[in-house]
Regions:
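Cytosolic regulatory regions built on CNB/CRP/Popeye-like sensor folds
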Residues: 1-201, 206, 210-221, 227-235
Length: 235
């Protein structure tokens, strides 16, 4: 049966042992489909039904640069004092972007999750003067490509394409960082914690408290008190 006419549903697992002729068996999509879908969303290019269009071929060329990598929680991906080497497309999991002081103190700047693409936004991070680190918060499935090859492929596709692509993430990170700093200086910690619960419920469920505390700008003991106080109000 042509996939166009196949319902996009699957039968309940409890029916699978019955060998019922009405059971709908869905073919598992290859891993590369997740990569192509992710690139399609990031670049705003529709692939299905447009496979021969130049933009679709561009995505296919980009996809060839990536390989899949599965990592455990707390796997270091990029480290300070070394040029940032790769671009990452997150299929599953959460990554954190942070700086680490010589005394070991951590300052978390950003979290990235499913569907996000992570790469060295700042020119300095592509040199040995890099001060940023990237580590997995949870087990993660990633698509990884060499950053220089990735940038070169985009630049060769059209003049001005790389600056417009790069600007989107740069602006997003700058806006989120400035807003977080503004809140840190103008709002008490309980209000900032409440906004964290409202705006990032998925992070609160999946990211360890000590990392959320650093992102919120409080010490772990304060974060624990905020968490206990908020839970008491809800009960």
């Amino acid at each position: 049966m042509n996939s166009i006419f196949r319902p996009n549903v699957s039968s309940a697992p409890c029916m699978l042992g019955e060998d019922n002729p009405d059971i709908i068996h869905q073919d598992a999509a290859p891993a590369s489909t997740a990569l192509l879908n992710g690139l399609s969303r990031i670049f705003g290019i529709r692939v299905e039904g447009h496979e021969n269009d130049p933009d679709a071929r561009f995505l296919a060329d980009l996809a060839r640069l990536f390989h899949q990598r599965r990592v455990d929680a707390e796997t270091g991906l990029e480290k300070h004092d070394s040029p940032w080497a790769n671009v990452y497309l997150i299929q599953h999991g959460i990554l954190r972007l942070f700086r680490e002081a010589p005394n070991g103190k951590i300052s978390v700047h950003h979290f990235f999750s499913e569907g996000d693409m992570v790469w060295p936004v700042f020119g300095r991070s592509r040199t040995v003067r890099n001060t940023l680190c990237l580590t997995s918060c949870t087990p993660a499935t990633l698509w990884v490509a060499d950053f220089a090859a990735f940038r070169s492929a985009i630049q060769s596709h059209g003049e001005g394409l790389w600056p417009s692509f790069a600007l989107a993430l740069t602006e997003e990170m700058a806006e989120l960082t400035s807003m977080r700093e503004f809140r840190k200086h103008t709002m008490p910690a309980p209000e900032r914690y409440q906004l964290l619960l409202e705006e990032y419920p998925e992070l609160v469920r999946r990211v360890p408290d000590n990392q959320l505390a650093s992102w919120l700008g409080v010490v772990p003991a304060t974060f624990s008190r905020l968490k206990t106080g908020a839970a008491g109000k809800r009960s």
